[in-house]
Amino acid sequence: EVLLEGPSGVLFKDGQKKYLPPGVKIVLLSKAGAVLSNGDNVQF
């Protein structure tokens, strides 16, 4: 779950921080993780 999303990054509920390059967004979010528009995956 996303706790906070801003133009330069995302803070997930579990405390993970992911810095995002300009223009990159979350395209898919589930209980297991997130997929970003640049193809990166974040697992939680």
Curated annotation (Swiss-Prot):
Tissue: Calcified shell.
Domain of life: Eukaryota
Family annotation (Pfam families): Cuticle_1 (PF08140)
Swiss-Prot/TrEMBL Sequence repeat ranges: 3-20, 27-44
Alphabetized UniProt keyword annotations: Cuticle, Repeat
Repeat among keywords: yes
MF (Gene Ontology): structural constituent of cuticle
Protein's recorded name: Cuticle protein CP463
